[in-house]
């Protein structure tokens, strides 16, 4: 009986390495009360810090988010948008693929991230970003709302994190008239904290006021906002609404070349970023280039 030698076993084959980077778009909401703003800061809890940490854990490689709006400490968001670049070979093992036919591609990842994130920040949706997409520089406009209550008792406890107590009468007609003077393309230096190398020229596209009982709401939209601009606009207009300033005063502020100290900035917790608009996919790249040129000008 002859013995035949079995051929040696082939060494196990490693899966092929997937080259390149995948850009993901993330739609995000957060309660800004306990955050020191969006941007990562050493020794401070921030929205970007919590999200970066969760994504880095899941993808097992350092990643960093870029957001459409870098909100200040205490400011909330229900419609923040960010993007993150992930190595393509980090995606396959980041989350289970089991799911139902027709489910969105990243639904399992969305569910897994929900277990890694604290209750005051949520990723609402994840999609593959189209070519040319940049969460910050491709954006056409940002929409904010500012809410305050003129009730004599302040704000009901369930809403106190999101509405500013303002138990004084406000003349919304005067505020609306003053707001009209601020519309359009202007240098808003009087309403912006100085940031080295940053322009303060902005296109203010909407600034209007409405009242429902004791709830007063401002809707504010612009191509972009400089640091603290929305709360400064609200603070100045509140001075007009209380008749401490004339309706023409805000127009005069537009002639200033630096930040004004003639009004108080409205409290952060009344402000929420609710939406970011983008152009059609085939215009994303060109919008990106135009915005970079304007912001560096």
Curated annotation (Swiss-Prot):
Binding-site list for substrate: 144
Keywords attached to this entry: Isomerase, tRNA processing
EC number(s) given by UniProt: 5.4.99.12
Family of this protein: Belongs to the tRNA pseudouridine synthase TruA family.
Subunit structure: Homodimer.
Active site feature: 72
Record-linked PANTHER family: PSEUDOURIDYLATE SYNTHASE (PTHR11142), TRNA PSEUDOURIDINE SYNTHASE-LIKE 1 (PTHR11142:SF0)
Name this polypeptide is given: tRNA pseudouridine synthase A
Pfam family, one: PseudoU_synth_1
Cited Gene3D superfamilies: Pseudouridine synthase I, catalytic domain, C-terminal subdomain (3.30.70.660), Pseudouridine synthase I, catalytic domain, N-terminal subdomain (3.30.70.580)
